[in-house]
């Protein structure tokens, strides 16, 4: 089985973290998001993945120079200009010569889904396209999918008012497509698979969806990226767990580190770190307290950082108190 993974976005929702690294290359539990995603696809029987690349493709090629990740063969398809989701899928699939049933995955989604079950369901229904769905407590912020008894998609409802949604099932960002679906996507144009292609297929009765209760998270917002990291510390994930402190990190013996991840080459003085992620090279000086935050930059001595995101150039002065802040500001950062 072959797959296309969409990794060409700008990562604007995760700025300033994505000012220096593409979103799918950010680590979750010391391992890049894209590597965790490809590993799960490989567990499900996917043997070849084409990365649909856009802005700044170089970090992906440099990370996997031999064209292999977790035993899965990689192909790099760099779109000449932003083509949105459907446009990128067609470009990448044709670049890779895909001419049979294939899988598509959004590059910022982490899930324990067994994709082979989605493929089996797709083939049993004779579908042209199949969407993986997950249930959420409040679907009003999402596009909701209404199904018939066989799993055929009847309609989409975008961001329904509270209490009016036909279901609590939302698009979870993994699909199975027939190669024939590519012909519904205009070449060389910006086309959304969610807003343009799927409604076309649904109108002909060829769009199906399967809901599962597998672990699933969209890592595209800071609070969810933080949660994805903390999830691999416990028993939330079926397969993926990690050690809290990377062996290449330097942590003062008197530091208090609770339910947090300390990345490679991070330095922590006699500080307190709770429910937080310190990424590669982050520095937290003695006396500082960091809670519910993601840190790439430097936190000065005796500073307090809560519910904040510090990019690579983010600096908190000694003694400064920070809460609910992104530094540098997202507007000042150039996303990838």
Question: How would you describe each model-predicted region?
Answer:
Residues 1-19:
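N-terminal nucleotide-binding beta1-loop-alpha1 segment
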Residues 2-5, 26-106, 110, 115-117, ...:
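Conserved N-terminal catalytic core of the sugar/cofactor nucleotidyltransferase
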Residues 14, 60-64, 228:
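Hydrophobic packing residues within well-ordered alpha-helices of enzyme cores
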Residues 25, 144-147, 198, 209:
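A structural signal for short hydrophobic beta-strand segments in well-ordered beta-sheet cores
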Residues 101-103, 110, 116-123, 136-139, ...:
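Catalytic-core segments of class I nucleotidyltransferases/pyrophosphorylases
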Residues 125-135:
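A short, conserved acidic/glycine-rich loop-to-beta-strand motif
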Residues 239-336:
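Structural signal for interior beta-strand "rungs" in well-ordered beta-sheet cores
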């Amino acid at each position: 089985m072959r797959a296309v993974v969409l990794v060409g976005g700008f990562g604007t929702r995760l700025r300033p973290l994505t000012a220096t690294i593409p979103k799918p290359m950010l680590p979750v539990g010391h391992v890049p998001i894209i590597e965790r995603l490809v590993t799960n696809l490989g567990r499900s029987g996917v043997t070849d993945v084409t990365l649909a690349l856009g802005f700044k493709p170089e970090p992906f090629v440099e990370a996997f120079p031999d064209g292999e990740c977790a035993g899965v063969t990689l192909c790099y398809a760099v779109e000449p200009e932003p083509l949105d989701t459907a446009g990128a899928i067609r470009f990448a699939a044709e670049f890779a010569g895909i001419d049979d049933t294939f899988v598509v995955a959004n590059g910022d989604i982490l899930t324990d889904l067994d994709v082979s079950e989605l493929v089996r369901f797709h083939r049993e229904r004779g579908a042209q396209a199949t969407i993986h769905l997950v249930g959420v407590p409040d679907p009003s912020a999402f596009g909701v999918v209404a199904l018939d008894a066989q799993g055929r998609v009847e309609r989409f409802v975008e961001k329904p008012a509270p209490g009016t949604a036909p279901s609590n099932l939302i698009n979870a960002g993994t699909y199975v497509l027939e190669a024939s679906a590519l012909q519904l996507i205009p070449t060389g144009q910006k086309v959304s698979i969610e807003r343009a292609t799927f409604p076309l297929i649904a109108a002909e009765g060829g769009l199906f969806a399967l809901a599962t209760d597998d672990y699933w998270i969209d890592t595209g917002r800071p609070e969810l990226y933080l949660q994805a990291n903390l999830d691999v510390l416990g028993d939330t994930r079926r397969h993926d767990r990690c050690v809290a402190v990377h062996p290449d990190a330097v942590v003062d013996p008197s530091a208090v580190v609770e339910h947090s991840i300390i990345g490679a080459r991070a330095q922590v003085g006699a500080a307190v770190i709770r429910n937080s992620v310190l990424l590669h090279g982050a520095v937290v000086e003695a006396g500082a307290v960091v809670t519910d935050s993601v840190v790439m930059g430097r936190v000065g001595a005796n500073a307090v950082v809560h519910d904040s995101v510090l990019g690579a150039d983010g600096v908190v002065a000694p003694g400064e108190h920070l809460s609910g802040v992104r530094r540098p500001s997202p507007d000042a950062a150039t996303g990838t």
